[in-house]
């Protein structure tokens, strides 16, 4: 059997190795050689080349000084552990003067100052010196720096301060509204990936579909712990506030090789996410985030502490003095001091209670009280308007009482309100036995319809359909509530209610229908003109004859025949019948009665006046009317 692998029974397979970025790629080597070759082209032969442009020949002694860009920064105030600290925003990152931090630690304990300086060297924190313009900007606007009598400033980024505090913090400090109720059945799984670049397993993983949340820092958020420590770490079971939890992790700490920027604990709303993204959990988390913002911001002068804050309990790990082997030993020795944790909690509660007794409303709302709050939108303006209506006792109950006293005050206020309401309804019931409470209807989100409508069944069909359509619109608006601000949500509701008819509003307000209007009174009948008896003396025959002739009616007059004689008379040619020249009045009355019996003259009877017959007879005497 030969030594050569060719033809041997045991074939040696080539070693399979995933190519790394540091491997020498022949293509890159060829490109590099071509680049070096083309850069050596000094003669301009008209051929394309990748070499750099030739420098212009200038006279000796002429030097071009290029101005180096330097961001002078913008002065601003930031909050650090409840204290207002001056800072400079350089390239979008706030930088704090280290001299201010040294002065704060010196007032507390000189050992803390030495430990802080050793910690900066151990953590290999990047520190920059302030330029003259930056130094003047801080000294002119900050009285704290002016009182230090310093000639230079050393700036440290807020990201480094935040991450160092997060690495040293074991638990958050107790708040004023702290209680020990940690209900396991009422918690939500949350996670943050603020320090995922420390996780070497995630960085070295080749799985492109791996969820980054699986490698994050996990914890449990308790819903019933608002304005206090509400998140428990899943790994160490430490209790944290949201601002402290995003700086907490259990990755191996790397003192060098990373540059942290943009680390801001006040952005916990964007950094913490719900791991179990069910509708119930997301709705509860969004409500918690919304209620975490106060109605208005205090001014910086009013927000400054009026009294010296009490000394904080030992809830954080001590800062080491040396960076050698004594590091772990100091942690163990200091960690053994806190044995009885419940006793420390009771002491902290007692200290907070004494502190609350010395506080006033001005410590929460400033010297000007609720009138000094400046709203940022209409929703905050409504809240501040309600605060201005409250008396001193109500404001004191809101800000100065303990949680137990506050809950008792709320229950007493609700009971008083119910008693007063029942008394008013009882008085109305005594006056009117048919009185009913006029509580308006309410929209049930789970059912998607309105409840407590007593007059819905008695409403018209169009009104009932309109209320059902309004309920569908309210249900759609409730689905989009997560994407809207509270003020936008209220304006959408008002816009929907503006288009509702008056009868639908009446049904939603539980107002009974209006009684039907009484029928209108019948119109007054015109009084008939008194009918006077017809007499021949009141008839105007002249006017009557003119009306008859104008209407085309011919009066039926009798044919007059000559008297009969016994002697034969000669034959006389007949002539048209005519009235006698001198008829008597009796004959005329007889003829007029015959004419008035005609149906065509019945409509003229009410118009005949007294003496009409006599006038008509006088007219016929002088006028001949042909038949």
From Swiss-Prot:
Expression (tissue specificity): Expressed in ganglia in the head and tail and in the anterior pharynx.
Region described as Disordered: spans on this chain: 1-22, 34-58, 299-318
Biased composition (Polar residues): 1-12
GO BP annotations listed: dauer larval development; determination of adult lifespan; negative regulation of BMP signaling pathway; negative regulation of transcription by RNA polymerase II; positive regulation of dauer larval development; transforming growth factor beta receptor signaling pathway
UniProt feature coiled coil, ranges: none
InterPro entries per UniProt: c-SKI_SMAD4-bd_dom, SAND-like_dom_sf, Tscrpt_reg_SKI_SnoN
Complex and partners: May interact with daf-3.
Protein known as: Ski protein homolog
Organism (species): Caenorhabditis elegans
Origin organism lineage: Eukaryota, Metazoa, Ecdysozoa, Nematoda, Chromadorea
